[in-house]
Structure formats: structure tokens, C-alpha cells
């Protein structure tokens, strides 16, 4: 018997046992537990891992579809366009690429809709667009959305997901922290509700401004929420930080959040909060 024939059978078995390639997009691997699941099942579960309950990032449109009453959402200010005030190299091209990729004009989607029949104004940040960073258009859209809620006399709800202020716009991006906060103060002065829902990740200037000043601050499980990065803080204070530092659970334990709701319960719980703070209230809780 030829030596080659001793190995040919093993090779054939190996070739027969090779994993078949799945069509692109059919399966999704969880980054937390490595479980591979059907993308359709993941989406049906509101992009929460069916094994470990890891919350995947959602697009702004996915949150609209999940959170608001079907067909009720009317978007605002889709015409606003970012300029390049500092002539930052390739900035305009990157914005255009993200617009094409996401279908959004900027890193936040704003508009009016209803939640179980109650009219609200929402702003939903999308980390797929420039990592949800806040530039002048993002700040302007959020400010206009708050002002619309104040004008209508309805609650304002924001879903935050951001890497912070957008460096390509310099001080103009930092100004949005103050501008949005002033609009929210006027909204509050009218006795109107503001609910901030912090999702993964909410950091930098966004966490230091409108994201943290809600009448009710809620987060999704395990969301990263903080200002500066862990390494920067550890080098500054010269101490080792807890493993769960800057997680939603850590912030809840230390009084910086009012509640953490898993995504499957979020709509119901926020709807209840809105009804409790709306004229007429709820009959039975």
C-alpha cells in the first residue's frame, strides 16, 4: 500500500467535516458569550442575545419601530446638514459616507410620535453615525426637539448613545452641551417631563450634559456610561478602579440612575412612567 493512501482517507474526512459557510447576515455571533444565533431570531428578540441577554446596539430606526406606536412617528429637521467649520481633512466625506450607510442626516433622529396613545417627542442617537458624536447639527436637532415638546406640552424622551463631543467641530460641539441643557431647563420650568434613557455607550460631553439631567434617568443593562476613559482616570487618581466601574449597574448602586430596565421591559415601563406624569394619570398601577 502506498504511503499516500494512508493519509488520503483522513484528508477526505477532514474535507467532508469542514464547516459550511453560511450566507452573509444569516447568523450573528454574540460578542459577550460567543453564542451563534439566527439573525432573524436576534431581531425578533429586539437585538438581545437569546443565551446571555447581551444587549446589542440598535439603529435609530430600530428603536423607533420597537418603542413607538406603529405608524405614529413623524421625523423633524431631516434637512439640517453639517458644515466643516474647522476645515478638518476628509470630514465632509466621512459625514457623507455615514449618511449613505445609515440613511440619517446626522447622528440623532428626532420627531413626534405616540407611546401607547400618549403624544411624546423623542430624540434617538445612533452610534453607527460618527459613533453618535455630538456636533452642531446634533445639538441643534436635540434643542429643537426639546422646544417642540415644550410647545406641545408633552414629555420629551431621549435615547443616548454617543462617544461624546465631536472633535472635528471643536468648541462648536462643546457649545451644544450648554444649548441643549438650557432648552431642557425651560422645558422643566413648564412642569413637563424629561426621561433620559442611557444606552451603550454614553460617554464624554453627552454624559456630562443632557444625558444625565433627566427627571428620570434610566439605562439598559451593562451600558457603558461615563465621562473620561478608565485608563485616563486610573492614571489621574493613581488607583485601580472597580471592574464594574462606569457600568449602568455601578451607577445605579451609587445613586446616579433611577432604574435599569432590560429592553424587553423598557417600552412598558416608560409608557407607565409617561402616563403617571400626564394629565389623567393611570387608573391602576
From Swiss-Prot:
Alphabetized SUPFAM superfamilies for the sequence: ClpP/crotonase
Keyword set, alphabetical order: ATP-binding, Cytoplasm, Fatty acid biosynthesis, Fatty acid metabolism, Lipid biosynthesis, Lipid metabolism, Metal-binding, Nucleotide-binding, Transferase, Zinc, Zinc-finger
Zinc finger (C4-type): 30-52
EC number: 2.1.3.15
GO MF annotations in UniProt: acetyl-CoA carboxylase activity; ATP binding; carboxyl- or carbamoyltransferase activity; zinc ion binding
Pathways involved: Lipid metabolism; malonyl-CoA biosynthesis; malonyl-CoA from acetyl-CoA: step 1/1
Binding positions (Zn(2+)): 30, 33, 49, 52
Domain CoA carboxyltransferase N-terminal per the UniProt entry, residue ranges: 26-285
Cofactor(s) needed for function: Zn(2+)
Quaternary structure, from the entry: Acetyl-CoA carboxylase is a heterohexamer composed of biotin carboxyl carrier protein (AccB), biotin carboxylase (AccC) and two subunits each of ACCase subunit alpha (AccA) and ACCase subunit beta (AccD).
Reaction it catalyzes: N(6)-carboxybiotinyl-L-lysyl-[protein] + acetyl-CoA = N(6)-biotinyl-L-lysyl-[protein] + malonyl-CoA
Pfam families: Carboxyl_trans, Zn_ribbon_ACC
Subcellular localization, as worded in the UniProt entry: Cytoplasm
Keyword Lipid biosynthesis listed: yes
Domain of life: Bacteria
Family under the similarity heading: Belongs to the AccD/PCCB family.
Entry function: Component of the acetyl coenzyme A carboxylase (ACC) complex. Biotin carboxylase (BC) catalyzes the carboxylation of biotin on its carrier protein (BCCP) and then the CO(2) group is transferred by the transcarboxylase to acetyl-CoA to form malonyl-CoA.
Residue segments, region Disordered: 1-20
Hydrolase is among the record's keywords: no
Note on cofactor: Binds 1 zinc ion per subunit.
Entry-linked HAMAP family: AcetylCoA_CT_beta
Protein name listed in UniProt: Acetyl-coenzyme A carboxylase carboxyl transferase subunit beta 2
Example of a GO cellular component annotation carried by this entry: acetyl-CoA carboxylase complex
Example GO biological process: malonyl-CoA biosynthetic process
Recorded coiled-coil stretches: none
Amino acid at each position: 500500500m502506498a504511503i499516500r493512501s494512508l493519509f488520503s482517507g483522513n484528508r477526505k474526512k477532514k474535507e467532508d467535516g469542514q464547516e459550511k459557510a453560511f450566507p452573509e447576515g444569516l447568523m450573528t455571533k454574540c460578542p459577550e458569550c460567543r453564542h451563534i444565533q439566527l439573525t432573524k431570531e436576534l431581531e425578533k428578540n429586539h437585538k438581545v442575545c437569546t443565551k446571555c441577554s447581551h444587549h446589542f446596539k440598535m439603529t435609530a430606526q430600530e428603536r423607533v419601530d420597537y418603542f413607538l406606536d406603529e405608524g405614529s412617528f413623524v421625523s423633524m429637521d431631516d434637512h439640517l446638514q453639517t458644515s466643516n467649520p474647522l476645515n478638518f481633512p476628509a470630514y465632509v466625506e466621512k459625514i457623507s459616507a455615514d449618511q449613505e450607510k445609515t440613511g440619517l442626516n446626522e447622528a440623532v433622529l428626532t420627531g413626534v410620535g405616540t407611546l401607547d396613545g400618549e403624544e411624546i417627542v423623542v430624540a434617538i442617537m445612533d452610534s453607527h453615525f460618527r459613533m453618535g458624536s455630538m456636533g452642531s447639527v446634533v445639538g441643534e436637532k436635540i434643542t429643537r426637539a426639546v422646544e417642540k415638546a415644550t410647545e406641545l406640552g408633552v414629555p420629551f424622551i431621549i435615547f443616548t448613545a454617543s462617544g461624546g463631543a465631536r472633535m472635528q467641530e471643536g468648541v462648536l460641539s462643546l457649545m451644544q452641551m450648554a444649548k441643549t441643557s438650557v432648552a431642557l431647563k425651560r422645558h422643566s420650568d413648564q412642569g413637563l417631563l424629561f426621561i433620559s434613557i442611557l444606552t451603550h455607550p454614553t460617554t464624554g460631553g453627552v454624559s456630562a450634559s443632557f444625558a444625565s439631567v433627566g427627571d428620570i434617568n434610566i439605562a439598559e443593562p451593562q451600558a457603558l456610561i461615563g465621562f473620561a476613559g478608565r485608563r485616563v482616570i486610573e492614571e489621574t487618581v493613581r488607583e485601580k478602579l472597580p471592574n464594574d466601574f462606569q457600568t449602568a449597574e455601578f451607577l445605579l448602586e451609587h445613586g446616579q440612575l433611577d432604574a435599569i430596565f432590560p429592553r424587553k421591559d423598557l417600552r412598558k415601563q416608560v409608557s407607565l412612567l409617561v402616563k403617571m406624569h400626564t394629565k389623567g394619570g393611570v387608573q391602576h398601577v
